[in-house]
Amino acid sequence: YGQTELSPCVTILGQDMHREAGRRLGLHKSNGRAMIGCEVRVVDENDRELPRGKVGQILGRGPGVMKGYWNLPDETAAALRGGWMHTGDAGYMDERGYVFLQDRVKDMIVSGGENVYSIEVENAIASHPAVAQCAVVGIPHERWGEAVHAFAVCKPGSSATAEEIIAHCKEQIAGYKCPRSVSFIDALPLS
C-alpha cells in the first residue's frame, strides 16, 4: 500500500498471503504489513492511535515519505504532522498488524454520530441483481446531521424500487448504514 507521497509504499503483502493459509485468514484481502524501516498506524480525528480493528485514518512514515508539496506550505503542514504522512485513507489494522483499506476519509458520512463509509454501502447496493452502478453521498438531515442517499443505475431490462434497494441493504449491512433515500438515474458521471 502506498501513494505518491509515501513513495513508493509503506506496507507490503507477501505472496504467501495469497496462498491457501493466507486466504483462510482473509489476509489476501489486506494491504499487508509495514515494510522494514516503515511504520503505519491508524488514528482518530484528533490523531490519537486507535485500538486494533477500529477504522480511522491511516498514517505512514519512513524513509520514502515526501518532504513536502512544492510551494504549498499549508497543504504540507496539513499532510505531514508529527512526522507522519496523513494519507486521507480510512482503514483499520488487525491484531497481526495487517492494514485493511476501507475508504477515503473525505467520503465518510456521519449520520447520527455513526461513521458510514460510502464504499461499504455501495458494495451492498451493487450486490442487488438489478443494479449496474451506484454511488452514495451524505445529504443534510435535520435530526441525524447527514443521511445516506444513493444514486443507482439499473441494468438494461431491469428495474427496482427505492424500497427494494433499502430492504436489500438491510440484509447486507447495519441499519444505520442503509440509504434513507434512493434516486434512480440513467448514468453516473464518470471522470
Regions found by a protein language model. Give the residues of each.
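Generic structural signal for residues in well-ordered beta-strands
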Residues: V40, C134-V136, V182
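A short acidic, often aromatic-flanked loop/helix-cap motif at beta-alpha or helix-coil junctions
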Residues: E5-L6, L188-S191
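Conserved catalytic motifs of the protein kinase core domain
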Residues: V55, A147, S181
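Conserved AMP-binding/adenylate-forming
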Residues: T4-V99, V105-M108, V121-E122, V131
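AMP-binding/adenylate-forming catalytic core of the ANL superfamily
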Residues: G62, K67-G68, A78, A90-K177, ...
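Extracytoplasmic/periplasmic beta-strand context in beta-sandwich domains
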Residues: V10, R180-S181
